[in-house]
Amino acid sequence: MTEPGTSVSAPVAFPQDRTCPYDPPTAYDPLREGRPLSRVSLYDGRSVWVVTGHAAARALLSDQRLSSDRTLPRFPATTERFEAVRTRRVALLGVDDPEHRTQRRMLVPSFTLKRAAALRPRIQETVDGLLDAMEAQGPPAELVSAFALPLPSMVICALLGVPYADHDFFESQSRRLLRGPGIAEVQDARAQLDDYLYALIDRKRKEPGDGLLDDLIQEQLNRGTVDRAELVSLATLLLIAGHETTANMISLGTFTLLRHPEQLAELRAEPGLMPAAVEELLRFLSIADGLLRVATEDIEVAGTTIRADEGVVFATSVINRDAAGFAEPDALDWHRSARHHVAFGFGIHQCLGQNLARAEMEIALGTLFERLPGLRLAAPADEIPFKPGDTIQGMLELPVTW
């Protein structure tokens, strides 16, 4: 079969930095104009498939002939620091069925819609406390450190049973792991987090608490369903994903709303639009841009053959701006049906914590703009730094006043 996805004349390098923090990189424009699959080149010169079409993405993310196991020899690496963790499997996200199914079943009860709803009063209390402190301090404020980051950190610590007093440590090690400049730093961050969680698990075995980590120790580790290494891998994933992604959505979501005054005014006038607004922001921002897979068999999709052992990258920011999936995709529209986006992935690896993330975002953004109706940027928008394209997207800092 022919490979029409190769129509892009010269492979675009992947990943690329965004020129605007809430839009896909302009360097991806040829991919947006092309077919659902094209070729891109990675940092090491390797050519892989990139998926940009919405329908093709949902089909492929549901296809178990694409593996998430990064220890496979031909699994794609988008950065050099990825090589630091390639040899070690990641719980849940980096395993395939049936192992993935077993791990997911352990965690599902703690992340249901009902469980997220039960946590809403605690989330609201945490949001109120953080905003009380901001108002008491007075403007200006740096919203990432004062609000966007501590909120999900506090929530995931309470859910897992991890002491929030340790947040400076695990937040800094998470940053090094996700954005460290080289292999040595990433490996050191991984080792530091491992040591911390092994010690915490050993302490909890002697003195159990009431968090999810305690439940996993009692119900899985002590019964031999998982070993300590697997539990540490699960805990690392939950701890990092539980604070890093939501913090970025809150900071970037706030910046985006402040840059779209008409949509913000509509949201303030109709607070009931907030759930739809959060869904649209998830689509519009697409902060996790670059899901990775490798084919274990030949796969035909959208007139293209992906060969066994070929790498596949999902350009989420482009997929969620596909005009075939979303009318006027570059518009921020609270009235569209956006729930079919792939910001949380799709298929068996779809984000386990999405219900909790939605609850945190709805409460955080709704309360922030209600409590601080005069909220505005405290620096020119084009001078506010945001994260590079090879990591989860978000604001590095967000100076605001009111």
From Swiss-Prot:
PANTHER family hit by this protein: CYTOCHROME P450 YJIB-RELATED, P450, PUTATIVE (EUROFUNG)-RELATED
Reactions catalysed, as given in the entry: 1-deoxypentalenate + reduced 2[4Fe-4S]-[ferredoxin] + O2 + 2 H(+) = pentalenate + oxidized 2[4Fe-4S]-[ferredoxin] + H2O
Family: Belongs to the cytochrome P450 family.
Pathway terms, separated by semicolons: Antibiotic biosynthesis; neopentalenolactone biosynthesis
Region (Disordered): 1-28
Note in the entry: S.avermitilis does not produce pentalenolactone itself in vivo but instead a group of new metabolites that are neopentalenolactone derivatives.
Keywords: Antibiotic biosynthesis, Heme, Iron, Metal-binding, Monooxygenase, Oxidoreductase
Protein role: Catalyzes the conversion of 1-deoxypentalenic acid to pentalenic acid in the biosynthesis of neopentalenolactone antibiotic.
Cofactors required: heme
Keyword Endoplasmic reticulum belongs to the record: no
Biological processes per GO annotation: antibiotic biosynthetic process; lactone biosynthetic process
Chain's gene name: cyp28
Name by which UniProt lists this protein: Pentalenic acid synthase
EC number(s) stated in the UniProt entry for this protein: 1.14.15.11
Top-level taxonomic group: Bacteria
GO MF annotation list: heme binding; iron ion binding; oxidoreductase activity, acting on paired donors, with incorporation or reduction of molecular oxygen, reduced iron-sulfur protein as one donor, and incorporation of one atom of oxygen
Positions annotated to bind heme: 351
Bilayer-spanning residue ranges: none
